[in-house]
Amino acid sequence: MNSSVEKQNSEIPEKENEEFTFQDNSQGFELEFSTNKKTLSKIQKANLSLKTNDAFNISFLKAFSRKNHIYYHVNYKEFSVDICDTHGKNYLPLVTKSEIKKNLDKIKDEKVRSTISDIHFGAIKVLIKARFREGINSPIKMALIDDRITDRQDSILGAAHGNLVYGKFMFTVYPKYTTSILDQRLDRTLAFIHHFERNDLMRKGDKVFSITYLVAYALANSHHSIDYKEKDAIEIDDVFSEIGSVKSPTFTELDPEPNSWAIDIAQGKQPIGFKPKPTVSNNFLRFDKETSPSSSHQKSLEEISDKIDTLVVKLNNIS
């Protein structure tokens, strides 16, 4: 008899929809959650994996006639986040100068290593995994930004809103652009920020979730040596779309070309990278902008003219 009951139960189809309701008011917080094993199983089986082929077209026609040196990397990192660091006030650098230097040092040919000048960012996959039981309403907002860009709207590479109710949430961003290894603020090129909305779920010192991420990038000797895969700016697996959503960066629609515009084309400009020569005057070390012979001559004439004007004023006062 027990076997027939088990058989009947196994034939009962699972509900396709989950019910998730909660109430938050002055009386307190109340949560009612129900789900099916099918969706939960899908999310639990979702793997964090990223290959260079996911981001780059490796077999790419050589750019121009220059010999290209390209070194592909996929970096993996994981760390736990304290509940006090989930308010969106901090950022996580996904690529750092020290990391790039470490990979550059692995290039044995010093001559080739000295030519590497660019970092091509192909893809970043981020996995957030809860350190608490499944079934707790735990919304989280995330964004990957290029923090070197001062305009906040333009800095967004991709944004996501999810929930750790099933234990984890995952998405992938495809930056598909290049920066110099000499960039002064390289550590801010890929900055991950997050805001966990249940910041009262635990107390300071408690690790609320872990962040695991994979970054696929290439080190190369040219800005023109990489071909990226055709991908949307940000993607989310279908299974995670049931508990969250992603937003791509906006693409500006250009205004019609203005009827008139201007640009300064005056002579006497200094070349890019120009550094003024230091001079010592009255015990002061000065770094004045070097002037061309023509501008120096013009300055001398102006100084003579000023002295003549001053002398005329003094003579008038005497008379």
UniProtKB/Swiss-Prot annotation:
Coiled coil start-end: 289-319
Keywords (A to Z) from UniProt: Coiled coil, Host cell junction, Transport, Viral movement protein
A Pfam family it matches: MP
Superkingdom of origin organism: Viruses
Compartments, as annotated in UniProt: Host cell junction, Host plasmodesma
This protein's record includes keyword Transport: yes
One annotated GO biological process: transport of virus in host, cell to cell
Region span, Disordered: 1-20
An example Gene Ontology CC term for this record: host cell plasmodesma
Keyword Calcium: no
Primary localization: host cell
Subunit structure: Homotrimer, through the coiled-coil domain. Interacts with VAP.
Function: Transports viral genome to neighboring plant cells directly through plasmosdesmata, without any budding. The movement protein allows efficient cell to cell propagation, by bypassing the host cell wall barrier. Acts by forming tubules structures that increase the size exclusion limit (SEL) of plasmodesmata, thereby allowing viral ribonucleocapsids to spread directly to neighboring cells.
Annotated family: Belongs to the caulimoviridae movement protein family.
Protein name (database record): Movement protein
Organism encoding this protein: Carnation etched ring virus (CERV)
